[in-house]
């Protein structure tokens, strides 16, 4: 990848709960400075992938991998404490729920500098000075008022800006944004996404954007990965993915992305069927029950197809039906 050195490299990641597979045999690289989008419906495994990376899996969920390296560390041989320290020092996280990281009973100033101090980046006074500067950078004209506010006194868009400032406190090399504009109106959504682009330009950090809306990723990411039922079904440059989508699920997802397909007064389309939460251990195509092009070959073990130029697809018939979405 041209952006820079690899910050994260994962090979053969499988995530499971006690009774089912959640993510199967997934490979992922994240390069320095890149803008990476990860798309898929709810239940596709996008958030579970990032929670595994951040070492905050749900209870009773475990993983195995052939390799998992981050920022020069071999995470397979780190203790939980060492892994969390690596995450805290190198990764900033912006959650989907704007209240997720903000304690309702504590003022913003009481929580925004915690990670900065705990990772020995500086004193509390230095942390608050940095917080004030970052709050200005994310668009607040009155950072002192924000620092003295409770989360419930701020609007959803303001809370998300606070979350972004918190994620930047430790000068991370990687920022992960999990559906960062959910529940925000369209104008605020665009402001938040434009803010991520400004952060990328100003700091050069890598940003991973998780979204169900491919149209949003088309505007803001340079490389896009499409996940379905715990698998990476297609990946490539965002331009290539949108010009020549190879997997039927990618094309179906384009058809239900609000910013790509929805006209004024029109009801959003849906992909028939649902994302399965069981049976993910199969080597066959798990999208086949929902795919209009499924055939006998889709019930055999799939191999990833290298389509050239960094474009790959997990499909027995890559490119089939492409004329439908030309």
Where are the regions that the model predicts?
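The feature captures the beta-strand-to-loop junction immediately N-terminal to the Walker
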Residues: 39-41
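ABC ATPase NBD coupling module
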Residues: 75-92, 118, 240-245, 276-282
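Hydrophobic anchor residue at the start of the ABC signature
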Residues: 112, 164, 175, 188, ...
């Amino acid at each position: 990848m041209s952006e820079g050195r690899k910050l994260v490299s994962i090979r053969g990641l499988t995530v499971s709960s006690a009774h089912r597979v959640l993510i199967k045999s997934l490979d992922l690289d994240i390069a320095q400075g890149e803008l990476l989008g990860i798309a898929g419906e709810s239940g596709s495994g996008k958030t579970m992938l990032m929670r595994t990376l951040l070492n905050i899996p749900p209870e009773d969920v475990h993983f195995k991998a052939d390799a998992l390296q981050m920022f020069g560390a071999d995470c397979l041989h780190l203790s939980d404490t060492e892994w969390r320290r690596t995450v805290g020092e190198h990764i900033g996280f912006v959650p989907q729920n704007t209240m997720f990281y903000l304690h309702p009973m504590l003022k913003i100033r009481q929580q925004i500098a915690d990670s900065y101090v705990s990772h020995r980046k500086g004193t509390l006074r230095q942390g608050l000075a940095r917080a004030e500067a970052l709050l200005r950078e994310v668009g607040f004209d009155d950072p002192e008022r924000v620092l003295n506010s409770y989360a419930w006194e701020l609007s959803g868009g303001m809370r998300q800006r606070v979350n972004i400032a918190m994620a930047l406190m430790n000068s991370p090399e990687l920022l992960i944004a999990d559906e960062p504009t959910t529940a925000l109106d369209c104008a605020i959504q665009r402001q938040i996404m434009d803010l991520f682009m400004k952060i990328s330009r100003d700091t050069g950090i890598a940003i991973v954007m998780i979204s169900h809306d491919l149209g949003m990723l088309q505007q803001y990411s340079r490389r896009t990965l499409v996940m379905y039922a715990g698998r990476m079904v297609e990946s490539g440059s965002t331009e290539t993915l949108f010009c020549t989508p190879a997997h039927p699920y990618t094309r179906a997802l384009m058809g239900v992305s609000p910013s790509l397909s929805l006209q004024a007064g029109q009801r959003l389309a849906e992909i028939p069927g649902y994302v399965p939460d069981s049976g993910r251990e199969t080597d066959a195509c798990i999208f086949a029950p929902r795919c209009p092009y499924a055939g006998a070959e889709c019930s055999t073990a799939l191999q990833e197809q290298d389509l050239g130029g960094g474009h790959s697809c997990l499909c027995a018939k890559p490119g089939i039906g492409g004329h439908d979405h030309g």
